Each structure stands twice: as C-alpha cells, then as structure tokens.
From Swiss-Prot:
Upper lineage: Bacteria, Pseudomonadati, Pseudomonadota, Alphaproteobacteria, Hyphomicrobiales
Entry binding sites for Mg(2+): 462, 464, 466
Protein name listed in UniProt: DNA-directed RNA polymerase subunit beta'
Family: Belongs to the RNA polymerase beta' chain family.
Cofactors named for this entry: Mg(2+); Zn(2+)
Residue ranges crossing the lipid bilayer per the database entry: none
Reactions it catalyzes: RNA(n) + a ribonucleoside 5'-triphosphate = RNA(n+1) + diphosphate
Residue sites binding Zn(2+) 1 per the record: 71, 73, 86, 89
GO cellular component, one term: DNA-directed RNA polymerase complex
Biased composition (Basic and acidic residues): 1388-1397
C-alpha cells in the first residue's frame, strides 16, 4: 500500500509530447552517454544465491536493484534511503523497474564493422569506399591486407595484398615506406580519411560528363549516399563500432527454473560470446601474442558481434545447446513474431472475453445477449466501485468476496452498471470495419453470446460454432465513440458500395416471400377491408387466406405531410408487410405490393433509409425480421425428394446432344475439322444441353398447378421458393440436383469433354463420380491457399493506403476524370448513374439533346440527380476524383465525394485509404472461400455473336467491309464500330466489330431489338484477302515452314504453318500467301502495298496453292485458346498482379504515336515493326516482336496512339507513359472491377482510385533544372512540388518530372515514414537505409502513430491534431503581428529552427 501512497506525493512525469522521430547511426560518444557502466565479465547470476555477479551481464551496480528500494547486500531498505548509493555493494536504492531502462556497454579491444551496413544490400560501407563487398569481407575477416598509404612505392592506394605479397612488399620497399592495414581498423581509417564534400563535387562533375548509359546510374547511387551522410551529420566511421551497447537486463531475462536450471534469452548467450572473445583478445594483446593468434581472435570477435546483431546474415548460423538458431537483435524486430507486428501493431486487450455465439431473434438491432457470468467478470471494477459507493463493502477485498459469492445485490448492481454501457463484439477474421461493432448488452442465462440475426452478414457469422470476442470500452470517450460511431444501428450501409448491409437473409426472406405470394381462387377473394385489424380478424377465423386477392385501405402521407387513404389491390399478407412501412410520400405501397425476393427487400430498405432516415430504418428492419421469422415458422415449408422434379424432356435433349457429339467425332475422323475445333464444338454442345435441361427443369418446377377439385392453386414447390426468394440455394445448385451436373473441369482448368449426365437425385455412376472429384478437391485446396493470399493482399493494400486521410474540404482543382457506362457485348453492365452516384461533378452536366445544364459543377450527385442523368440519356460525365486531387497530404472531401457508409458528404479526418483497402480486400477473402460451392462445374465463357438490345438505325463507323464469294458482308477493318441510333439521333449502343466477323445489317438499315448484328467464329481468328485474284504460296517450304499434319485419329491432313526458324534452312524465310492477277503480278491493296499476307506459327491454311479467291474469303485460320473456366482463382492473382503493377507474361505492345505501320528487316528471331508517326517532328518508332506471335496490324495500316500492335494484357506502365494517368486509372479500375463483377461483388470505383493514387505518389525527374536532383531520381510528388516551389521563389529553373507507377509492395516500402515501412516488410533494409540518411518520421500516417502509441490522426484522433495545428498557426500569427517592426528578426530565428528539426 505504501507504494501507492508514495505515488500520490510524486506523480510520475507525463511522457513528453513529440512531433517527430529521427533515426540515425549512434556515435561512440552517444553509446557511452546511454551507458551506466562497462560490462567486463561474461557471468550472469550466481547459481547458489541467485544474485547477479558484479560487472557481469546482470550487474546490479550498473543496471539497478533487483527489489524495489533495496540494495543488493541488504544494508539499505525502504523508501527513506531513495537515491543513496550503497558503499558496500555500489547499488543505487531506487525502483527495480530501472532495470528495464538502463543500458550498459562493452568496450571493444578492436573495432568491429556493423553487419547491417556491411551486408544489407547495397552495402553502405562498400558504396562509400567504392569497394566491392567481396574485397571488403576479405579485409574485414583478415584474409587480405589493404594499402592505406602507398608512400613512394609502386603500390596503389586501396590495393589488396595477400599475406605473402605483404611480406614481399615489406622486404622490397622497407617496412616504413608504406602503410597497409587489415581488419576493421584499416577500413575505419579509410572512412575517417574520406572528404565527403569533395567526393560529392567530383561525382557531380563525373555524372555530367559521362556518356554511357549505366555509369551515371551507378555514380548517382553513390552520390545519393554521400549526400545523405553530409545532410544527416552522420560520420562514416560510426559504421565501424568501438563500443557495443548492452540492452537492459529485464529485456533479456534470465529466470531460474526449479531443478537448478535456467531459462534464458538467446541474447545473453550472444553477449556472453562477445565478452569472452573480447576479454581473451585483451589478454592476448597484453601478453604480446603472435600476430596470427591476435588476428584470429579479432576475426572471431567480429563474427560474434555479427551474430549478436544479425545471426545468420553472414557465415554459419550460431546455434544454442538445442541446435536451434539463436535469436539475434535483428530477429527481435523482423517478421510476424517481431517487435513491430507482434507487440506494437498487435497488442492484446484486457477486459475482454470470448464465447460461442447463438442466435437472438428477440433482440433489438442495437442489443446483444451477454452471459451473466461473463458480464460479472468483465465489469468487475465498476461493480467494486458501486459496492463501495453504496456502502455495501468497505474494502476491495470485501467487495471481491461479495462478487465471488454472487450475492443478489451484486446482480442488481450489475444491471445498473451495464445499462447504457456499450460493449464491442468482434468476430475474427476482421476483414473490414464492420467486423467490430458496438452493442448494448442484455444479461442472459447460459454461457453463449446472443447475436442479432441481421448483423450476421456484416460479421460474416453463422451459428455453426463460431466464436466472438467481447471488449469493454472503459473511458467515457471510448464509450462515446462506441455509441456514436460503432453502434450497429449506425452501420446500416456497406462501406464498399453504399448498399444496405443489414439485409434479411435465409428464413426471414423465405417468410416474407411466403407472405407476399398471391394466388387465384383462394377463399375470401374479392373481399374489401377497411383496416389491418379487420384483416387480422378475418385471417383468424379463416374467412380469408394470406394469399387471396383482396382490396384494402392503405393510409399514407402526401408531400405536405397530410395523411390520406387509398384503396389498393393486394393480399392480406402484403398488407401485413405494408403496415410496417414508414409513412412517407417517397415510400409508396408498391414497394411491398409484389412478390418480395431478397433483392426487393434490399431495395425496400435502401429506399426507406434514403427517405426516412436511420431511426425509422432500424425500427422497420427489426419489425420485418420479426414478421419474416414468424411467417416462415407458420408456413412450415419443408421439402422432400419428390420436390426435385426431373423433366421428362431430359432424355430427349441428352440423346440429341449425344448424336451431335458423335457427328463432330465423325467430322473429325473424316478430317473436316481439327482436334481443337472438335473439342470446342463438343464442349459447346454439352454446355448448351445442360442449360436447356436446366431451363426445362426450372419451367417445370416453377409452373403453377391447379387443384382440379377446389380450383385453387397448389402449394408452390418448396425448393423453387427457396431459390427464387434468395433464401438458400441457387439455380446452379438446383440444376445439379434435378437437371444434369454438366461439364467438369480438370485441375488444370481445361474442361473434360464428357459431361456428367446424371444429377444428384438419380445418383452418379462410378465414372461420373470420379470425374467430379477433380472439381471438388480443387475447390477445397483453393480455399485453403487463397484465404492466406487474400489476407496478404489486404495487408499490402492497407499498408499502401494507410495515410490517405481526408485533410481538407476542397482542394479547388479543376481536374477530373471522365466516366462512361460500362458496356460489354452490347449490354449496359453498370449504368452511368451507378458510377457517378455520390461523386462531385467537375463540369456542368449538359442534356445532350437540348444543351441545358442538368447539374452544375462542384455538385454532389445524389439519387435524384441520377434519375435526371438516366432520363436525359447522358453518355459521359466529368467528375472529380482522388486521382487528380491536389491536396498536399491526404485527399480532399470534394474529390472523394460521398461517404458510402453514411450516405452524406465525407467527414474531415475520415481514413478513406484504410476503408478502400478493406473494401477491396474483404471480398477477396469471401470469394476465395466460395470457389467450391458450384462443385467445380464448368461454365464456358464465350460469345460468338452480337445481339441488339435496342431498336433503331444502324450506323457503321470506319466502315471497311466487303462482300465475300457467298455475298455475305465481312468486316475487314480492325477498328470498325457499329452504333445503334434512336429516332432522336442519340446513340443507344455501340459495339466494336471483330476482324473477320460476318455482318447481317449494313449502314442505314433498321434493326429490331433482339436481332443479331454480326456473328463470328469464336475458336479461330481468320486472315482475309481484300482483293480478288489467285492465291499463291510464298516461302511455304514443305517440312521447313509448313507441314501436312495428319491427325492421328483420322489420317486426314491439314496444312499447318510450323516454326520455320527451328531449322537452319528456314532462318530467312517469310511464309506468306500472296494474291496475284491472271498475269502473275502481285496485286496492290488500297493503301498501295502488295497483297502479301504474312503467316504466323500454327496458322491452318484454308486455300490451295493457285486457287481463285474472292475479297473477304478466308486464306488461313489461327486457332485461339480452348475455353477455360474463369473463377476467382484467375481472379485473386489477377487483382494482385494489377495492384503490384507487374508486367503481364505476354504483354501487349502499344503504339506510342499515331502513324503508318511498316514491316522492317527482321532481326534474329524477331519481327521488326516500324511506326512512322503522322506528326513529322517525331522519329519513327521501332518495335521488335517475337516471330510467330500474331500481329494484329497489316503493312500500311494507320494505327492510333494507344492502340495495340500485339494483342494481350497491356502493361500498366506502358499505358501511363503513352496515354497518361486518366487512361491508366480507367484501365486499372475496369480490370479490377471485371474480376469482382464476375463474382457479383459490388465495389465502388473510388476505392480502387484511392489505391491507384497511392501507387502514383512518386515522380521521376526527367530534367533537373537548377535543382540538386539527378535525372532518373525518384521523389515523392509532395517533395518534388515543395522543391519546385522553392526554386521558383528564388527565380531558378524548376525541375520537370513524369509520374511513376509503383506496385503496392514497393510503394509501401517507399513511403516517407520509415516506421511504417519497417513494420511492413524487409525491416532490416528499411532501418539501415533510414539510419544512414538520418531520416525523420513526421508521424503523419496511421501506422506510425499506432506504433509510437499515440492516437491516430484520423477520425476523433485527427481532431486534436487539427486543433493543435490551428493553435500553433494562431500563435505564430500573433508573434508575427507583434514583431511586425522587425520581420527580418523573426525569419532569422525560423531558419535554424527548420534546420534543427
């Protein structure tokens, strides 16, 4: 107790507030200033007395007493001797916790190189001295001498000499004529002799004068390091240590176990080795031992210090007694178990508990059920203080007894304590911020936590044994934040897409679906009801059923808020739901007057939230939930095996397809089609068959059946109800239950040709069962692997985006990006309205027909505006985007737009970066877990025709078509587009036509909805002739460039172009088909070139030598890949590839300028393509393309800047360089969205944009102007702008730079904050780099602040920082006003302050 009393009298000094943290290399003086004494002996603790040995690693004299206020020998005990140093044992009487703070040091007998600066690549010592790492190690580990001072001899400075050479040189030149050294001492002398300023100046000159490509890069690296040393004030020789600090003993504890053994930290072993070797070296030096022995001892000392700092970085790993590698200081920081990630970013929490969750349907949305036992334990301190306040107990001990006995008054007090005190519930894995929410606890019996059913979706929880953790917010501020920000009722919308996340599912959906069914000829049809109570009465006496068609009176409000009633045609069930709807003019009864599926319910909740606000929505959701559960229970829906109806038509359909497959097989045997074409066709046929069986089955199951006697409709099929309502199951699963399972994929992703004809009801044959195991097993394996991958992706995303915070209301930029609807194969997949909802306009939005302003600029687009945009049929809108935001640090509110989770403009201090990362990462994990649900059934992703979705007139842009010999229109151009124009002349749809597709309509034709515009063969890419004439082969040498490939199965041969470069004879062949006229002259094409069509490898010839061809005929076909299934497996790695900005394997080659294409002279095995730009001032651009790749342009084509010369995925860096930031952003956003859309996951574009903004935070200097930067140097965009602003202020030429795209891992490691980077990856490298350049961390991001233990500068934590900043500015202004007479003085004071910081 006396300890506490004392603490009242001397309150501990509050920790000093600090604004930044600097890291640099410790000088020997600095190390000594930390130390409380030198450690001379390797001993630790006396094993009999358990007292620390004097001058040893645990010495009490150096580090402080073991017991509070008690010296070692026991002469001084108690507080009153505080601060006295005992004359007998030399220990200061003070708190024992100083043993956690005080450091010691070891005085080394010989200097030692710090391994981090030596071995962490690039080696800093090596760069400084301009020596290779190999040479350095030779000197440091005593293999070679190095010449320090050649004197008048013919030796060179820094020349390495072996032992023999050194002795020879001494003999030859005399011992004193030159100096050579060995070991760290020699390196240290070289370091001390460096004149950094001079070297820097020399290097600058050298870089300016150098002509080669690589040299300046190398020199620039060295120059950068030297400048870092000059700027930071670090001295190079500090990288060689003469003292070693020893960390406090409590941080490397030694604990006696029973049985006389000790458990110790590995560091003690490592320190002991260093001390032993150091002492031995000292003794040998005193004894004047032979040089070779001393050298050996010094080498061993160097090795032991290396092991202490970073064990295993060089040479063998030092192991302990049990053969396990010892954990060195570097290992303490590194990795998931290191200091950063284990203790600083991932702390454990007191006042928490965990238990299994069960469903609590009678809870309100803001409540959770907390077991009494748990609550009693968690709220103990509150209960104690209440007991004391009420006078029921005098001491804490008494209170403890009362609580342990569980007296009745304790329960009463617990009820009081718990009232209005929210608790946090968390379910691991916490993938997004909705994984932790606050609830008000309700005490319950039992041992399981009760959870409200509607929040399950947010937690991704189910009740099959999931556990959840409970945390108690203690302080008033914490309770306030929990209630205002984290309460489940405040988190109704999903932060990723702004749709409601509190959506009923499963039983509730089924109940609501059942209630809203409408049937004919029910008892009570046509009755009229005046109120809901009448309906309830009628239902109770069975005068009417839930599903009867009746009329009823519904009361609602008009726009002025007055009530009025209307009579509606509805059913009693729908009236029950309608009764719960909040009354509002914009919430019509039509919302519930329909068959409610999950999607309708979600829409209904969304509408209610937008118009009636949060409170109404929460009440409404709770009521719907209760109704849904009650009705599902009353309905008693169940299903049996007979509910799975297998259609009779199945046998017929299967038989038809079987004959088709046999027919294709026969065609293949006859040699009419290739193996690949047969495979594709068979797979196609079976996929169609499966779909048709599924359709027939769905019609069968969903058909309404009438009972002949009562004329009433029969009960709807239960399985259909479940799937159709969205409660459970999907058509895909029903197809497998009662249709046919269909095609299966091999583990490689290829589709097996033979489908599974049976369904689960019939049962699979052994062979079918075996085929289906592939998919099932792959699904399970995928799940395990990808959960980890997805988690890692989220971690990288969070790390790159963590310092994107809303820092200002509006940055005032005029920039923005233009957004258009997403159209695929003519379908509008994402409408323009959906894409711009919640964004700020960058320009006025005009009505394309009338030209009037629909929405002014700088206006936040809401739902009403979206309707306006859709009605006016606007095609594109320029909106503000975080990509073009000009806020100095963070992002501004106007560029970000709406906060999706609240539906309001985003607040200041919102951590939008983390929200973006979670929104992208969270579904990744969800999706990876969802691969095996469809049991690996293959879905062929393919389209081979375009259908019109609108009626209108056809308009063909860049029309380049010909009629072939059959009179069919064939597309000959690569950028032909077809547009459908409505009667007002507005463009309804636009499709790009593939080369070689067959057109059904021509320019100006009328088209109806659903008619096919064009068709093409999806399996091959044709090569067409543009002129009529006679086809002749060129360079098609049998056996070299062309082979008759006889199909093994059929014996029929087709002529295939083979890789002609493989044989020596074919090296200069250029296989082609030329078209000649009757006289044998090569015909000319429209663009003036010869009609020569170059062939690529694997092309299959379709014409014979000398055959007559007609324009538009196919000369050759190039087979495309077989259909592989796409599932998120392709997805997750694809998302990672995009965010990491990797170059794809076969990346596309993009034209850098608009120009004419010409084929140059081939180079080895590459084709040379030259683009002659239209703009005369530009040089022609050459591209080398591997032969055999199919090039999508012909000689003489005009290609636009940004178009593909070689198809494939484009490399994002190319898009940035050629088309700019906006194009790059559009590409990345669309590609990422494609992956997620395939899985039906909605993510708002702005989240992806936030990540892309952080990938573009660096710029590369192109011309340095008058700055001190170097060409090719990468700078932070903010740093670059600051630098240029300073240069302009001084009237100097500013530097110019281009944006650089970095992958997320690289961008995270290159943030301005070294603390954040070190806690992410490659800790050693980051810290080494930061220390050398004396980096300062300004603590602006979230992560750095968590690590140093401060509030994060976002949300409520950001408020304090802003206030402090404002106060600081105010003070500065006042000082400036007061010192108005002498402004110069104040500026002078400021300069060194900046420098000092």
């Amino acid at each position: 107790m006396n300890q506490e009393v004392m603490n009242l009298f001397n309150p501990t000094a509050p920790t000093q507030t600090f604004d930044q943290i600097k890291i640099s290399i410790a000088s020997p003086e600095r190390i000594l200033s930390w130390s409380y004494g030198e450690i001379k002996k390797p001993e630790t603790i006396n094993y009999r007395t358990f007292k620390p040995e004097r001058d040893g690693l645990f010495c009490a004299r150096i580090f402080g007493p073991i017991k509070d206020y008690e010296c070692l020998c026991g002469k001084y005990k108690r507080m009153k001797y505080k601060g006295i140093i005992c004359e007998k044992c030399g220990v200061e009487v003070t708190l024992s916790k100083v043993r956690r703070e005080r450091m010691g040091h070891i005085e080394l007998a010989a200097p030692v190189a710090h391994i981090w600066f030596l071995k962490s690549l690039p080696s800093r010592i090596g760069l400084l001295l301009d020596m290779t790492l190999k040479d350095l190690e030779r000197v440091l580990y005593f293999e070679n001498y190095i010449v320090l001072e050649p004197g008048l001899t013919s030796l060179k400075e820094r020349q390495l000499l072996t032992e023999e050479e050194y002795i020879d040189a001494q003999d030859q030149y005399g011992e004193d004529s030159f100096t050579a050294g060995i070991g760290a001492e020699a390196i240290r002398e070289l370091m001390m002799a460096l004149d950094l300023e001079k070297i820097a100046a020399d290097l600058r000159v050298e870089i300016a004068e150098s002509t080669s490509e690589l040299k300046p890069k190398k020199l620039a690296k060295r120059l950068k390091l030297i400048e870092a040393f000059i700027e930071s004030g670090n001295k190079p020789e500090w990288m060689i240590m003469t003292q070693i600090p020893v960390i406090p003993p409590e941080l490397r504890p030694l604990v006696p176990l029973d049985g006389g053994r000790f458990a110790t930290s590995d560091l003690n072993d490592l320190y002991r080795r260093v001390i032993n070797r150091n002492n031995r070296l000292k003794r040998l030096m005193e004894l004047r031992a032979p040089d070779i022995i001393i050298r050996n001892e010094k080498r061993m000392l160097q090795e032991s210090v290396d092991a202490l700092f970073d064990n295993g970085r060089r040479g063998r790993v030092i192991t302990g007694a049990n053969k396990r590698p010892l954990k060195s200081l570097a290992d303490m920081l590194k990795g998931k178990q290191g200091r950063f990630r284990q203790n600083l970013l991932g702390k454990r929490v007191d006042y928490s508990g965990r238990s299994v969750i069960v469903v609590g349907p009678e809870l309100k949305l803001h409540q959770c059920g907390l077991p009494k036992k748990m609550a009693l334990e968690l709220f103990k301190p509150f209960i104690y203080s209440r007991l004391e306040a009420k006078g029921l107990s005098a001491t804490v001990k008494q209170a403890k007894k009362l609580v342990e006995k569980e007296r009745p008054e304790v329960w009463e007090i617990l009820e009081q304590v718990i009232r209005e005190h929210p608790v946090l519930l968390n379910r691991a894995p916490t993938l997004h911020r909705l994984g932790i929410q606050a609830f008000e606890p309700v005490l319950i019996e039992g041992k399981a936590i009760q959870l409200h059913p509607l929040v399950c979706a947010a937690f991704n929880a189910d009740f099959d044994g999931d556990q959840m953790a409970v945390h108690v917010p203690l302080s008033l501020e914490a309770q306030l934040e929990a209630r205002v920000l984290m309460m489940s009722t405040n988190n109704i919308l999903h932060p990723a897409n702004g749709s409601p996340i509190i959506v009923p599912s499963q039983d509730i959906v089924l109940g609501l679906y059942y209630v809203t069914i409408q049937k004919d000829n029910e008892p009570g049809e046509g009755m009229v009801f005046g109120s809901v109570s009448e309906i309830e009465h009628a239902l109770a006496v069975k005068a009417v059923t839930l599903h009867a068609k009746v009329k009823a009176r519904y009361t609602t409000k008009d726009a002025d808020g007055n009530s009025y009633t209307e009579v509606v045609d509805t059913t009693p069930g729908r009236m029950m739901v309608g009764e719960l709807l909040p009354r509002h003019p914009n919430v019509p009864f039509d919302l519930v007057n329909r068959l409610l599926t999950k999607r309708d319910i979600s829409k209904m909740i969304d509408v209610v939230y937008r118009h009636c606000g949060q409170k109404e929505t929460v009440i409404f959701c709770d009521q719907i939930m209760a109704l849904g559960f009650r009705q599902a229970f009353r309905a008693g829906i169940s299903f049996g095996k007979d509910d799975m109806v297998i259609p009779e038509e199945k046998a017929k359909l299967v038989e038809e397809t079987q004959t088709l497959a046999t027919e294709y097989e026969q065609q293949y045997i006859d040699g009419l089609i290739t193996q690949g074409e047969k495979y594709n066709k068979v797979v196609d046929a079976w996929a169609k068959c499966t779909d048709r069986v599924a359709d027939v089955m769905m019609q069968k199951i969903s058909a309404v059946q009438i009972d002949p006697e009562t004329k009433r409709e029969k009960q709807i099929n239960s399985i259909y109800m479940m799937a159709h309502s969205g409660a459970r199951g999907s058509p895909a699963q029903m197809k497998q239950l009662a249709g046919m399972r269909g095609l299966m994929a091999k583990p490689s992703g290829e589709i097996i040709e033979t489908p599974i004809i049976s369904n689960f009801k019939e049962g699979l044959t052994v062979l079918e069962y075996f085929n289906s195991t592939h998919g099932a097993r792959k699904g399970l394996a995928d799940t395990a692997l990808k959960t980890a991958n997805s988690g890692y992706l989220t971690r990288r995303l969070v790390d790159v985006a963590q310092d994107s915070i809303i820092t200002e209301e509006d940055c005032g930029t005029i920039g923005g990006i233009t957004v258009q609807p997403v159209i695929e194969a003519g379908d509008v997949i994402v409408s323009l309205g959906t894409r711009v909802l919640g964004r700020t306009t960058a320009e006025d939005v005009m009505n394309p027909a009338t030209g009037e302003v629909l929405i002014p600029k700088n206006h936040l687009i809401d739902e009403a505006d979206v309707d306006t945009i859709e009605e006016a049929n606007v095609q594109g809108i320029k909106i503000r985007s975080v990509l073009t935001c000009e806020a100095a640090n963070g992002v501004c509110g106007a560029c970000y737009g709406r906060d999706l989770a609240r539906g309001t403009p985003v607040n200041m201090g919102e951590a939008v970066g983390v929200i973006a990362a979670q929104s992208i990462g969270e579904p990744g994990t969800q999706l990876t877990m969802r691969t095996f649900h469809i049991g690996g059934t293959a879905q062929v992703v393919d389209s081979s025709f375009i259908e019109s979705n609108h009626a209108g007139t056809i308009k063909i842009v860049n029309r380049n078509v010909v009629k072939d010999s059959n009179g069919v229109l064939v597309v000959m151009g690569r950028n032909v587009q077809v547009q459908i124009i409505d009667e007002h002349g507005g463009e309804r749809a636009s499709h790009k036509l593939t080369y070689g597709s067959r057109l059904k309509f021509d320019d100006g034709d009328k088209i109806e909805r659903g008619q096919r515009i064009s068709e093409w063969d999806p399996y091959t890419m044709p090569m067409l002739t543009e002129v009529n004439g006679i086809a002749e082969f060129e360079d098609l040498v049998d056996g070299v460039s062309i082979r008759e490939v006889a199909d093994e199965a059929t014996g029929i041969s087709s002529r295939v172009v083979v890789d002609w470069r493989a044989s020596p004879r074919g090296s200069d062949l250029r296989p082609a088909v030329v078209v000649k006229d009757k006289n044998g002259k090569i015909l000319k094409l429209a663009n003036g070139n010869d009609a020569r069509y170059l062939l690529s490898v694997d092309a299959i010839l379709s014409v014979d030598n000398g055959a007559a061809v007609h324009a538009g005929d196919v000369l050759a076909r190039i087979p495309t890949e077989g259909a592989k299934t796409r599932d998120i497996t392709g997805g997750l790695p694809r998302v990672a590839e995009l965010f990491e900005a990797r170059r794809p394997k076969d990346h596309a080659i993009i034209a850098e300028a608009t120009g004419r294409v010409e084929f140059g002279k081939d180079y080895k095995n590459k084709r040379r393509i030259i683009v002659h730009p239209v703009d005369e001032s530009l040089e022609p651009i050459e591209y080398l393309i591997p032969k055999g790749k199919h090039i999508s342009v012909q000689e003489g084509d005009v290609i636009e800047k940004g178009e593909f010369i070689l198809d494939g995925h484009p490399a994002p860096h190319d898009i940035l360089a050629i088309s700019g930031v906006e194009e790059l952003a559009a590409y990345l956003v669309n590609e990422v969205q494609d992956v997620y859309r395939l899985q039906g996951v909605a993510i708002n574009d702005k989240h992806i944009e936030v990540i892309v903004r952080n990938m573009l935070q660096k710029v590369e200097v192109t011309s340095p102007g008058e700055s001190i930067t170097l060409p090719g140097e990468q700078l932070d965009r903010a740093e670059f702008d600051e630098m240029n602003a300073k240069l302009e202020a001084q009237g100097k030429t500013p530097a110019t730079a281009v944006p650089v795209l970095l992958g997320i891992t690289k961008a995270s490691l290159q943030t301005r904050s070294f603390i954040s980077a070190a806690s992410f990856q490659e800790t050693t490298r980051v810290l080494t780099e930061a220390a050398v350049s004396g980096k300062v961390d300004q603590l602006v991001g979230l992560k750095e602040n968590v690590i140093v233990g401060r509030l994060i500068p976002a949300g409520t934590g950001g408020m304090l920082q802003r206030l402090r900043g404002e106060a600081q500015n105010r003070d500065d202004k006042i000082l400036e006003d007061q010192g108005g007479a002498t402004p110069t003085a104040s500026t002078e004071i400021k300069e060194p302050a900046e420098g000092a910081a």
